[in-house]
Amino acid sequence: ERKRVIIVGYRKDLGKVFTPPKPNLYKPTLKDAIWSLRLSKPALDKNYTNGDANLAAPNHEYMTGGFSTIYMSRNRVRSWEEPSFTIQAGGRHAPLHPKAPKMLFIEQNKRIFVPEQEHLYRRLTVRECARIQTFPDDFIFKYHNIADGYKMVGNAVAVEFARQLAQVIYKDIILSSDSVL
């Protein structure tokens, strides 16, 4: 949902003008991205990593701990059929897993978890956030504290987006000239 500005420029002597790839109008859903991921684990005490040997998939662990008043001021749950919220560079702000029901509106800027369903509310794992950012499952994030994993994923440019830009640049610069560099 957050807008981004990407600037691509070519040297004048190349005589090229960057034309961005056509936008993909399909918006992948949470089901598309993370449905197949199962058996997540909470982080260890103080949000230290479990280590990949103890996880069903690399980095498939989630931050534990409370939620701030600001976090609880909005619904943080999207359904399986919706695209994810923007992945931010911090685990405390990670979206909640779609298995949980939408948060209940109490009053302006105040929501709560559905009573007797609180056990369903957990943050997305680092791996789930990475999948949403289109990282392949064999890309391993190395960290001791899980907050650093969320930070790496949230600060990253989505892999598929970067790939599409790189393909255009490669075609324009590398494939169309013998001596570019």
Question: Where do the PLM segments sit?
Answer:
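Short acidic, glycine/serine/threonine-rich loops at helix termini
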Residues: 1
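S-adenosyl-L-methionine-dependent DNA methyltransferase catalytic core
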Residues: 4-181
